[in-house]
Amino acid sequence: MAEGLAAEDESYRILRSRIDLSRLPPLCRTVTEHVIAASADFDYATDLLCDEQVLAAASAELAAGAAVVTDSAMVAAGINGYPVICKSEDALTARLARTAGISLPAAAVRLAFGQAGPGAIWVVGSEPAALGEIMARNVQPSLVIGLPAGLAGAAEAKDAVRASGLPALTNVSEKGGAAVAAAAFCALATAALASGELDATTLNSR
């Protein structure tokens, strides 16, 4: 445990020695640092599109108990200490994907819609089509973390989310992935804990 924390501290020390993100507002800076640390990709310093007010509102919703939905088990595995709704490995999800001719992450999002309710935080890192499902379902999210990777449709899907007017954290390019999406969420949760908005005791009881 101590070795892991030391390695993490060293990672952030190296990051801050190589790039100055002080121009960014606090939440955007925290998210950007987490994403760069998780990916070792400094391009995210300019590739991520963050809105401080959107992140602040989502942080408040998180503290109030907002549901968190992921499009895949890989994204869910990267979110430690916060309960998530993830339907990607349910038998019903596989059946829906086959009958509807859609991907498993898209089917997982479709099935999670009824359980999550309005105000949820949707974390998508595996499949661009999952973002299409979110837009089609009128989910009324507090935040869509839309960071799937892919050469076929990922950048376009993220652009569509931004154009939709949904509160979103996305990036411009085709890059992304489960680890990046999970890191962005964990950054938000970490910031909420540090500010006192999110109480660790309450978090562990959820």
Language-model segment annotations:
Residues 1-69, 78:
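Electropositive, gly/pro-rich neighborhoods at or near active sites that engage anionic ligands
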Residues 38-46, 94-97, 119-120, 143:
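Short, basic, glycine/proline-bearing loop/turn elements
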Residues 61, 67-108:
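Glycine-rich, small/polar surface segments that engage phosphate groups of diverse ligands
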Residues 89-132, 176:
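Glycine-rich oxoanion-binding loops at beta->alpha junctions
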Residues 143-152:
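ADP-ribose/adenylate-binding Rossmann-like module
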Residues 152-206:
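C-terminal functional extensions of proteins
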